[in-house]
Amino acid sequence: MESPAFSKPLKDKINPWGPLIIMGILVRAGASVQRDSPHQVFNVTWKITNLMTGQTANATSLLGTMTDTFPKLYFDLCDLVGDNWDDPEPDIGDGCRSPGGRKRTRLYDFYVCPGHTVLTGCGGPREGYCGKWGCETTGQAYWKPSSSWDLISLKRGNTPKGQGPCFDSSVGSGSIQGATPGGRCNPLVLEFTDAGKRASWDAPKTWGLRLYRSTGADPVTLFSLTRQVLNVGPRVPIGPNPVITEQLPPSQPVQIMLPRPPRPPPSGAASMVPGAPPPSQQPGTGDRLLNLVEGAYQALNLTSPDKTQECWLCLVSGPPYYEGVAVLGTYSNHTSAPANCSVTSQHKLTLSEVTGQGLCIGAVPKTHQALCNTTQKTSDGSYYLASPAGTIWACSTGLTPCLSTTVLNLTTDYCVLVELWPKVTYHSPNYVYGQFEKKTKYKREPVSLTLALLLGGLTMGGIAAGVGTGTTALVATKQFEQLQAAIHTDLGALEKSVSALEKSLTSLSEVVLQNRRGLDLLFLKEGGLCAALKEECCFYADHTGVVRDSMAKLRERLNQRQKLFESGQGWFEGLFNRSPWFTTLISTIMGPLIVLLLILLFGPCILNRLVQFVKDRISVVQALVLTQQYHQLKSIDPEEVESRE
């Protein structure tokens, strides 16, 4: 730079202080983020750190996706400087230790150089990465430093009028007009550039800031910008075995075991009691899964009747088959085991997906503390903790309606109070019909609403204020009892599949369990009881209930939509839907037909013009030939002849 203001030698721009020990600060806060979906919401915190002192100058948190969480960050220059600059010329009095120094600092320009991408000759932390002119990429100076590739821009903010000589309102000068907390009167505004919004922020990034002075060395400070990401609504597996993603393909459909009619007692069997009811039969696969969908429909129809006017309820073929919603509730203490602590109500299955925050008991590890709104420690003694109606304890050892404090005190087990909901997804009819018609194009996959999202928290009053039935009425209704009964029946059937393989590895048992569930849904699909939508088995439901023959209902609805679509078309548009080869035929012969039509329209005119042109040329040629056979006679004037005579 040729300007006199930039003519200071490089050695004057370098402060004679030793190297900074900042590697630990640079490494400590970065963490990579694994993105599952571009639409997933995170809790993003941006932190600006003064690397000279290690203090935080700004920490701003907001909720959003990874593509739109780039806010403006407001802080003060003195937050990056501390009490004073590391200045070789302290007699000048710049810095932030005194009101006068803060006021003088406000009068100077500043420039910023990136440390995350250091250009050749720009130096290191000692020079603030500004070892020569041209390294600066942003700042507030009269030459307006800028860059098209740096990640941020840093400018001065608006200083209120009458702010005064930067007095600190927290000390004795608080009564002076214009005093501010900490005497901050050098506001800065940090904005992200387009390059910064596209960059990876998995690790902290560093910049150097220098105060521009026409005489003397330019003081240096260093700061870093870090992004910290926390997942909102964590889905944390509870239990020793996480979800196994690999699933074996189904080999054969599962047969439904129909109940056999009771046989008459054999003659001479005096021990048989006449008129005794036959032993109860467990429901078959079809009945068990249909009861699960029916119970989900009844609970949804009770709480949100507007959503069940016409909808599709789908069972997923892959794990997890159940979801837990952590809730807060009041459990009851019992000195002896209550009736619901029987062996039949205990389940060895663990939940692989739990959302929300609720009541936790026991030694909860740090990996699962995000599920806890309140954590209670068990006291000494032997008693039982029974979960409220409609809830269950999800423990690291399995599902149970009641806890034994003796077991909790002797082991490292922990439990979370949850509502248990089957993994039933809710789809609108337009989405389902569009998938089968393959006409509707979605820019992105619609968010799947599950029963846990629609009804989660109702039993404990989480969203019961908007439900006319109320919390108590919902738990006590027959619809909710029907869903709970279907859940316990299905859990019992799933657990039997695992218990039959207890002698094998637990992971192998879960693989077989997943295969069994896929076979069950395959049987329903092959029987026409449900419609296969991707990896889900969907049942049609309206205000009349769940339709057993869902495939027939799907075909009926698709035919109705096709007729309605055709009735709204004109006769010309309808031609292309009558035959599959009609469109191909038209597109094939349309080109030659258009060319032939153009020839017939403009051909005669072009031909006439061509013939006339040829005739004109021939006439000219004939005239030339005739003129070559004759010569022009010399003209004689009669008066000249008479004069000669």
UniProtKB/Swiss-Prot annotation:
Q: Which parts of this chain are annotated as the region Disordered?
A: 259-286
Chain spans, region Receptor-binding domain (RBD) = 32-237
Q: Which GO terms describe its cellular component?
A: host cell plasma membrane; membrane; viral envelope; virion membrane
Residue interval(s) of motif CX6CC: 530-538
Q: Where is the signal peptide?
A: 1-33
Record bears the keyword Transmembrane: yes
Q: Which residues are glycosylated?
A: N43, N58, N301, N333, N340, N373, N409
**Residue ranges of the TM segments:** 586-606
Topology, Extracellular side: 34-585
> Which parts of the sequence are annotated with region: Immunosuppression?
513-529
Q: Where is this region: Fusion peptide?
A: 447-467
Tell me the Gene3D superfamilies matching this sequence. 1.10.287.210, ENV polyprotein, receptor-binding domain
What is a biological process (GO) this protein takes part in? fusion of virus membrane with host plasma membrane
Q: Which InterPro entries match?
A: FMuLV_rcpt-bd, TLV/ENV_coat_polyprotein
Coiled coil, from the record:
490-510
Cysteine pairs forming cystine bridges in this chain are C113-C130, C122-C135, C311-C314, C311-C538, C341-C395, C360-C372, C402-C415, C530-C537
Q: Where is this motif: YXXL motif?
A: 630-633
Which residues does the entry place in the Cytoplasmic compartment? 607-640
Q: How is it modified after translation?
A: Specific enzymatic cleavages in vivo yield mature proteins. Envelope glycoproteins are synthesized as an inactive precursor that is N-glycosylated and processed likely by host cell furin or by a furin-like protease in the Golgi to yield the mature SU and TM proteins. The cleavage site between SU and TM requires the minimal sequence [KR]-X-[KR]-R. The R-peptide is released from the C-terminus of the cytoplasmic tail of the TM protein upon particle formation as a result of proteolytic cleavage by the viral protease. Cleavage of this peptide is required for TM to become fusogenic. The CXXC motif is highly conserved across a broad range of retroviral envelope proteins. It is thought to participate in the formation of a labile disulfide bond possibly with the CX6CC motif present in the transmembrane protein. Isomerization of the intersubunit disulfide bond to an SU intrachain disulfide bond is thought to occur upon receptor recognition in order to allow membrane fusion.
Query: What UniProt keywords apply to this chain's record, in alphabetical order?
Result: Cleavage on pair of basic residues, Coiled coil, Disulfide bond, Fusion of virus membrane with host cell membrane, Fusion of virus membrane with host membrane, Glycoprotein, Host cell membrane, Host membrane, Host-virus interaction, Lipoprotein, Membrane, Palmitate, Signal, Transmembrane, Transmembrane helix, Viral attachment to host cell, Viral envelope protein, Viral penetration into host cytoplasm, Virion, Virus entry into host cell
Lipidated positions (S-palmitoyl cysteine) are C605
**Assembly and interaction partners:** The mature envelope protein (Env) consists of a trimer of SU-TM heterodimers attached by a labile interchain disulfide bond. The activated Env consists of SU monomers and TM trimers.
User: According to its record, what is known about the domains?
Assistant: The 17 amino acids long immunosuppressive region is present in many retroviral envelope proteins. Synthetic peptides derived from this relatively conserved sequence inhibit immune function in vitro and in vivo.
Name of this protein? Envelope glycoprotein
What is the species of this protein? Xenotropic MuLV-related virus (isolate VP42) (XMRV)
Its taxonomic path starts at: Viruses, Riboviria, Pararnavirae, Artverviricota, Revtraviricetes
